[in-house]
Amino acid sequence: MPELCRFYNIVIKMIYSDNDQHHKPHFHVYYAEYEASVGVDGELIAGSLPVKQLKLVQAWAAIHEDELYAAWNNAVRNIPFGKIEPLR
């Protein structure tokens, strides 16, 4: 699962060919013992994150929405995608 971004101890990854599980563009978030799937639109789809970290992820996703959709479109076609700038 390639890493898209890392900031504030939050790791964001996207899986190739992963449109069957949730049927919407999403990415996977890892923070300490927490794991979650978050839609490109910022919706928490599965799992859990502390509120502060979820808000940081949602802010990052809003800033990079176009890049996330581009990465998703590549990922579902098994085409490599690049990293996205972290939240600063």
Regions found by a protein language model. Give the residues of each.
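Aromatic side chains
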Residues: 7, 16, 27, 69-72
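C-terminal structural segments of small proteins and small subunits
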Residues: 58-88
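Alpha-helical protein-protein interaction elements
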Residues: 8, 19-22, 52, 64, ...
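A short, structured beta-strand/loop element
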Residues: 15-51
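Short, charged/polar N-terminal "headpieces" of proteins
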Residues: 1-23
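Glycine-rich, flexible loop/turn motifs
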Residues: 3, 40, 45, 77-83
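A short mixed-secondary-structure module that forms the rim of ligand-binding clefts
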Residues: 55
